[in-house]
Design a protein with these regions (language model features):
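EAL-family c-di-GMP phosphodiesterase catalytic domain
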Residues: 4-7, 21-28, 47-62, 74-166
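Conserved functional hotspot residues or short segments at active or partner-binding sites
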Residues: 67
């Protein structure tokens, strides 16, 4: 929320997120292709977030770790997208040097239950404790927004703000 305020006043540039499939991420020419795009468009990677789904960690954690480190060394930021939809493991989060954890909308849908609130709050706290910013997906109303703000979410996405553009 502070980020949005700073962006409004022109102090920082908006982030551009790019979703990458597991297949693309694990391909051998993935990093080379990104370097070419950066060069071609004279793009500075610090404002680009590469979003990978947690599934990539199931293929080979060491390869995923290496590719994430290479992306970050180039200046990109990296997010684990849809956290909690697959075989989430908190253990791999501490092994991966990512900038953001994007928590899946199913956790927002459970905010009407006490257990759901506790789980979401704990995931946010764990993410912060390992140095990750948290993006909550699927916020659709004011009460959900207020809860995730109280829980400490750094960023939110959802239909409450805008329907997706095609």
């Amino acid at each position: 929320f502070e980020y949005e305020k700073q962006m409004r006043f022109g102090n920082i540039k908006p982030l551009i997120s790019i979703n990458i499939s597991a297949e693309t991420f694990m391909s051998t020419d993935f990093l080379g292709r990104f370097k070419k795009i950066m060069y071609k468009y004279q793009t500075h990677p610090k404002n680009i977030v590469i979003e990978i789904i947690e599934e990539v960690c199931l293929y080979d954690i060491n390869i995923a770790k290496s590719k994430i480190n290479n992306l970050r060394n180039l200046g990109f930021q990296v997010a684990i997208d849809d956290f909690g939809t697959g075989y989430s493991s908190l253990s791999y989060l501490s092994d991966l040097e990512v900038d953001f954890i994007k928590i899946d909308r199913k956790f927002v849908l459970d905010l009407n239950k006490e257990k759901g609130k506790k789980v979401l709050r704990d995931i946010i706290n764990i993410s912060h404790s390992i140095g990750c910013k948290v993006i909550i997906e699927g916020v659709e109303n004011e009460s959900q927004l207020q809860l995730v703000k109280i829980f400490g979410a750094d960023f939110v996405q959802g239909f409450y703000f805008h329907k997706p553009n095609t």
